[in-house]
Amino acid sequence: MSGFWESCLQRFEQELPAQQFNTWIKPLRLEGESTALEDGLRLIAPNGFILKWVRDRYLTRIEDYSRTFFEGPVTIALVIGSGKATAARIQATTTDSGQNAPANPATTSEKRTAASEKARGKGSNYEKSRLFPSFTFDNLVVGKANDLARAAAVQVANNPGGAYNPLFIYGGAGLGKTHLIHAIGNTIATENPEKIVRYVHAEDYYSDVVRAYQQKSFDSFKRTYRSLDVLLLDDVQFFNGKNRSQEEFFFLFNALIEARKQIIITCDTYPKDINGLDDRLVTRFDWGLTVQIEPPELEMRVAILKKKAEAEGIQLDDEVAFFIAKHLRSNVRELEGALKKVLAYSSFHGRVIALDLAKEALKDVIGSVRNVGMDNIQKTVADYYKIKVAELFSKKRTRAIARPRQVAMWLCREVTSHSFPEIGDAFGGRDHTTVIHAVKTIDSLRIKENELNHDLHVLLQVLKG
């Protein structure tokens, strides 16, 4: 029977993105490999959250594969690992390695000091770059939400001035745009120490323009910026209404591009949607490649929490990571804040980080997160698309009704913890396979259709208040 599970793992590893496979399938184990086949198979999940997720999304595929492998139907039971085993694992983690003990501030400080010393060793150009040495590609968690942006960023870092110039990265606050452009800068500075790389926030650029105007030092200002090999401009939306800054940046942009110097820009919205921005700049931002970073999906949120905890010298238990990730969905900054609160609570009270402690530490934070129900989602979607709520439950299949219905189902899956069957019941008693199809359809279309992706973004913001 171990041959079956090994084959099953290989198949899932080929079919699923690495993060989904590592989060949901890899932690499962087959119990009782010597048990007679007629007694069925028992798959052990490490906790209830993984069990529910696998049961809703993957169990049917496992059952289908078992029928093919064993050439007949096989009963598969999905259960949580015994409490004894779980307790032993937690005890071993806390007593043997100390990884789940309260954070040691000295450890984090030492890591940051080491990173700074390494950065200083890169030369005087790096000293003036204003880059954060701790933001690298190695410690950037990658998922569906940012995989395209990361791929483009790596291309630019490996071939500055040649690929995707300018690179325009947009997305909401706290999604990792700043981390990504610092990672580009750090890679270029490390591999090309002779290049002059500079990170500049849009407000700092504005301040430099004002200072040059007041001191009548525009020649020096222009020389400084035009000497750059790589310009990383963060939060360009702050140029709104700052006409002189926009004019100076327009000429700087032209000069750098003409000299085949690399420009990377971040913003909280798509270039054409930036308020108060000169049309000439909008046009030039479209010369290169524009990529979006979206809010992280559940697997990515879990991976981010574990990575951040690891950086603090903590091995975060799965149940704690899933609990935080399930309730806080907006952005990376929100996750980091919640994790810091849990670590501080653990340190202050001298308690091991476990699910009950996380619930205590975050009761105010999670209590303030708006509780969105499926009925609220249905009403919001119906209002947005100007249809009746009853039409979402109907048998109508016209595009004007079917697409909003699929969007509503996708939102129910994204925003609530309801299973596919529960969502199907809420939409006129539809089968769970209909919901699965709707979710997959929207996931696929949102990558290709900017208008649909915009609709989803707006609806999510409305629902999350």
UniProtKB/Swiss-Prot annotation:
Subcellular location(s) of the protein: Cytoplasm
Residue ranges of the region described as Domain IV, binds dsDNA: 347-465
Region listing for Disordered, in residue ranges: 93-125
Ranges of Basic and acidic residues composition bias in the record: 109-125
UniProt xrefs under SMART domains: AAA, Bac_DnaA_C
Top-rank taxon: Bacteria
Compositionally biased tracts (Polar residues): 93-108
GO MF, one annotated term: ATP binding
Location of the region described as Domain I, interacts with DnaA modulators in the Swiss-Prot/TrEMBL record: 1-85
UniProt keyword terms in alphabetical order: ATP-binding, Cytoplasm, DNA replication, DNA-binding, Lipid-binding, Nucleotide-binding
Gene Ontology biological-process entries: DNA replication initiation; regulation of DNA replication
Residue segments, region Domain III, AAA+ region: 130-346
GO cellular component terms listed in the entry, alphabetical order: cytoplasm; plasma membrane
NCBIfam families documented for this protein: DnaA
Biological role stated in the UniProt entry: Plays an essential role in the initiation and regulation of chromosomal replication. ATP-DnaA binds to the origin of replication (oriC) to initiate formation of the DNA replication initiation complex once per cell cycle. Binds the DnaA box (a 9 base pair repeat at the origin) and separates the double-stranded (ds)DNA. Forms a right-handed helical filament on oriC DNA; dsDNA binds to the exterior of the filament while single-stranded (ss)DNA is stabiized in the filament's interior.
Family matches, as HAMAP family: DnaA_bact
Comment block on domains: Domain I is involved in oligomerization and binding regulators, domain II is flexibile and of varying length in different bacteria, domain III forms the AAA+ region, while domain IV binds dsDNA.
Protein name stated in the entry: Chromosomal replication initiator protein DnaA
Organism: Dechloromonas aromatica (strain RCB)
